[in-house]
From Swiss-Prot:
Receptor for opioid growth factor (OGF), also known as Met-enkephalin. Seems to be involved in growth regulation. Residues 467-592 are annotated as: 14 X approximate tandem repeats. GO terms for molecular function: opioid growth factor receptor activity. Pfam families: OGFr_N. Belongs to the opioid growth factor receptor family. This is Opioid growth factor receptor. The gene is Ogfr. It comes from Mus musculus. GO terms for cellular component: cytoplasm; membrane; nucleus. Disulfide bonds: none annotated. The lineage of its organism: Eukaryota, Metazoa, Chordata, Craniata, Vertebrata. The modification N-acetylmethionine is found at M1.
Amino acid sequence: MDDPECDSTWEDESEEDGEDGQADDTTDEDTGDDDGDAEEARPSLFQSRMTRYRNWRAMQDMQRYRHNYPDLTDQDCNGDMCNLSFYKNEICFQPNGFLIEDILQNWKDNYDLLEENHSYIQWLFPLREPGVNWHAKPLTLKEVEAFKSSKEVRERLVRAYELMLGFYGIQLEDRNTGAVCRAQNFQPRFHNLNSHSHNNLRITRILKSLGELGLEHYQAPLVRFFLEETLVQHKLPSVRQSALDYFLFAVRCRHQRRELVHFAWEHFKPRREFVWGPRDKLRRFRPQTISRPLMGLGQADKDEGPGDPSQEAGTQGRTCGSGRDLSGDSGTAEDLSLLSAKPQDVGTLDGDQRHEAKSPSPKESKKRKLEGNRQEQVPGEPDPQGVSEVEKIALNLEGCALSPTSQEPREAEQPCLVARVANEVRKRRKVEEGAEGDGVASNTQVQASALSPTPSECPESQKDGNGPEDPKSQVGPEDPKSQVGPEDPKSQVGPEDPKSQVGPEDPKGQVEPEDPKGQVGPEDPKGQVGPEDPKGQVGPEDPKSQVGPEDPKSQVEPEDPKSQVEPEDPKSQVEPEDPKSQVGPEDPQSQVGPEQAASKSLGEDPDSDTTGTSMSESEELARIEASVEPPKP
């Protein structure tokens, strides 16, 4: 049995002579401090008496509590458990009280009522010893067991603890560990705590009740908080003495109590006046893992030093873990952004290509290609290709598909284009010969199909809109401006077809009515596609795109009687009044739109023989004319 007059905190570490901590403290001379206290002058007799002073009444009271009131026996209360009934919300506290739920819900922010009413605290935090309120019954051992076994009662006890912490400007951060910290309104609440010293008695009661009702782990964090605020932060000077005399020794766990006493000894100034523990044992004592958790979250000790290595490692691990998580997200976010940016870039490229394919002017697309090639060159290096070569490449590329879907090499597309042209011509011949009963119309359609541009996706043919404006989209012995889009087979110029005239908007596309023979011979400068005619060339730099006068097949011989237009034939005359003989902007079929598939001329294919094709078609037309020519009037 411990001596009730002594402090049992250090009793198991007493020396062989049996002296306890208090005796060591009494006989200790202030010459062995390692922290600079030895350099101070020895205190006088009066100072020694003051430094050796300790509140013995407080020490005895707290030791009696820690030893579960050995001199106290439960009174026979006839089976009544008033404290348990109050916490079950069955009765009101006395005198003139309320139910516990009313207090927990309505008194939370009513600080004046919590300060002025002195009857509720004995009911909220009952003890085994009687208090000043004789209406409040002392706590019995049966009630203690009932408090610990009832979840409802335990929950209300924690809420009552949070209510009083808020009244003192403190916040419970973790219900599991009991860690506490300053509340947002701690300054006015600390001021009230300094002004009303009776709250020190309330805090002592709260600490004792927590130890009685199964919440012992809530004691040490709260005591550590008050030691921090009084000895380190110096915010609660009125609470300092009570914290050292009562709060420290309300902790029932001996090891935690030693940790707290050592913490108080380290921060007490002057240290030689510290009387709440034996100095020699405090010098030898080494804090363990309890120091850092006692403060609660966010209440790091500025003067303590390293503190708890395990908790620091845990905190660092959490920080590193969060840092790794953040870096992984950012990396994932970057990967996702890159993955999401790739299809956007592809879509942008496709959009640029579609915009370029639909550009109204082919010269602008050439200019953009040329500028793009120049920008790709390193500054200071000579241009490996001349301007003429770049223009040739641009012209050759115009003959190929520039749509977003055709990204294969252009050389592989040339045989496919020729094959598609031949198939298209054969299909048109079959359809037109079967559908049209008129020989003249059939003759005209055959010639139109033979002279129509090859189906291609060239942006030039899609951009020109009308034949006469683009001299490079047609190649043939006839006037390139005399052709209209492939959708209107009747708009072609034929020797026997009176509908082959170009409207008055194109003066060069008309057959002069003054020419009775209607022949297109070498004397007619417009019937030839020579070097003097800049509109008969595909490109000025492409030698394969010209049909020169040296080619005898490029002219229609005047000796061929079938190629002449008889003056007696009324169909060979130019009737300007005939609405069908004009191709104007009013005729929707006379325009070449970007939606026409067959918009490329055979002359743009350097591998195809344009002149030979035109001559063979002329002979075929002559044979068809001889067989189906109607009698002349």
